[in-house]
Swiss-Prot record:
This is Thaumatin-like protein 1b. Belongs to the thaumatin family. GO terms for cellular component: extracellular region. Disulfide bonds join C47-C57, C62-C69, C117-C200, C122-C183, C130-C146, C150-C159, C160-C170. PANTHER family: OS03G0233200 PROTEIN (PTHR31048). It comes from Malus domestica (Apple). Keywords: Disulfide bond, Secreted. Gene3D superfamilies: Thaumatin (2.60.110.10). It is found in: Secreted. InterPro entries: Osmotin/thaumatin-like_sf, Thaumatin, Thaumatin_CS. Pfam families: Thaumatin.
Length: 212
């Protein structure tokens, strides 16, 4: 299936020259990022253009009305790959995050570099295990994405917002455990960094795969 990847640069920095594009099955696309750089990548699915020429997607839409996202982020639920590229070949950080929910499997793997440089992947279709309260369904009744408990319920115990804004006051919940069980390498909620953050040094390239 075709996906429409999007990119978002963080920290109020200029966007990449490519903020989104169409990606056919088995195809690849190179995206240049400067160093240092920090941002995220995601994949939109079930996209179409209406009679008026407005482009939109049923999952992870960026609301721009066109294929390019132009500095707009994904509307959750959306699986995210987050990458922080260090200056001068220093230590990069990267992860797959389900903190904003899940819409499709993703992985990120460094090519080259030094240090750990292990791939991080969420290969499971979490939609198949998504509890009813978190499901987002298409018109035909199929589950097309899975909300985070924070998005579904807005409660600070799920969102890790004050007063529950420390690892001690925001432990895993039954909902984040579902994500954790499906994709143990991914961030399942805000304070899940024990086994979810990956590092690599020496200026590697990164290969991001949708539906690995």
């Amino acid at each position: 299936n075709t996906v429409w990847p999007g990119t978002l640069t963080g920290d109020q920095k200029p966007q990449l020259s490519l903020t989104a594009f169409e990606l056919a099955s088995k195809a690849s696309q190179s995206v240049d990022a400067p160093s240092p750089w920090s941002g995220r990548f995601w994949g939109r699915t079930r996209c179409s253009t209406d009679a008026a020429g407005k482009f939109s997607c049923e999952t992870a839409d960026c609301g721009s009305g066109q294929v390019a996202c132009n500095g707009a982020g994904a509307v959750p639920p959306a699986t995210l790959v987050e990458i922080t590229i260090a200056a001068n070949g220093g230590q990069d950080y990267y992860d797959v995050s389900l903190v904003d929910g899940f819409n499709l499997p993703m992985s990120v793997a460094p090519q080259g570099g030094t240090g750990e440089c292990k791939p991080s992947s969420c290969p499971a279709n979490v939609n198949m295990a998504c509890p009813a309260q978190l499901q987002v369904k298409a018109a035909d009744g199929s589950v097309i994405s899975c909300k985070s408990a924070c998005l579904a319920f807005g409660d600070s115990k799920y969102c890790c917002t004050p007063p529950n804004d420390t690892p001690e006051t925001c432990p895993p919940t039954e909902y984040s455990e579902i994500f954790e069980k499906q994709c143990p390498q991914a961030y399942s909620y805000a304070y899940d960094d024990k086994n979810s953050t990956f590092t690599c040094s020496g200026g590697p390239d990164y290969v991001i795969t949708f539906c690995p």
